[in-house]
Amino acid sequence: MFTLKKPLLLLVFLGMISLSLCQDERGADEDDGGEMTEEEKRGAFGNLLKGVAKKAGLKILSIAQCKLSGTC
């Protein structure tokens, strides 16, 4: 039981630090008045997700083409 206390305490401590940093940054954004809209957030994440999905799809297609043609 004693061996689990230190890592668990460390995880809780790091989680609290990251949470407080997020809250500080959120508060700074609200003070500036330059708040990012929900559409901008989704647009940035959507573009990243599309890029990753496109690369993964191309990789899967190239592997399938290789296996079907027997050139692997």
From Swiss-Prot:
Keyword Glycoprotein belongs to the record: no
Protein name, per record: Brevinin-2SN3
This protein's record includes keyword Transit peptide: no
GO biological process: defense response to fungus; defense response to Gram-negative bacterium; defense response to Gram-positive bacterium; hemolysis in another organism
Family of the protein in this entry: Belongs to the frog skin active peptide (FSAP) family. Brevinin subfamily.
Keywords tagged on the record: Amphibian defense peptide, Antibiotic, Antimicrobial, Cleavage on pair of basic residues, Cytolysis, Disulfide bond, Fungicide, Hemolysis, Secreted, Signal
GO annotation, cellular component aspect: extracellular region
Location within or outside the cell: Secreted
Propeptide section residues: 23-40
Disulfide bond entries: C66-C72
Tissue: Expressed by the skin glands.
Function: Antimicrobial peptide. Active against a variety of Gram-negative and Gram-positive bacterial strains. Active against fungus C.glabrata 090902 but not against C.albicans ATCC 10231. Shows hemolytic activity against human erythrocytes.
